[in-house]
Amino acid sequence: MAVQQNKPTRSKRGMRRSHDALTATHVSVDKTSGETHLRHHVTADGYYRGRKVINK
């Protein structure tokens, strides 16, 4: 079983974890319906970029 030779420093631990942070989701508001949605996704009522693309 592998055993470390020396204790990793707080700096090395922080550098390893520097890419682990979560980013906030990008939310847009539809021009026509005013509904919020994820970027490049259809809204819940079927609008995309101001046009009705899905009939419910």
Curated annotation (Swiss-Prot):
Protein's GO biological process: translation
Domain of life: Bacteria
Record-linked SUPFAM superfamilies: Zn-binding ribosomal proteins (SSF57829)
One GO location term (cellular component): large ribosomal subunit
Keyword DNA repair: no
InterPro entries associated with the record: Ribosomal_bL32, Ribosomal_bL32_bact, Ribosomal_zn-bd
Pfam families: Ribosomal_L32p
Swiss-Prot/TrEMBL keywords: Ribonucleoprotein, Ribosomal protein
Coiled-coil ranges (or none): none
Region span, Disordered: 1-35
GO molecular function: structural constituent of ribosome
HAMAP family: Ribosomal_bL32 (MF_00340)
Protein family per UniProt: Belongs to the bacterial ribosomal protein bL32 family.
Protein name: Large ribosomal subunit protein bL32
Protein's gene: rpmF
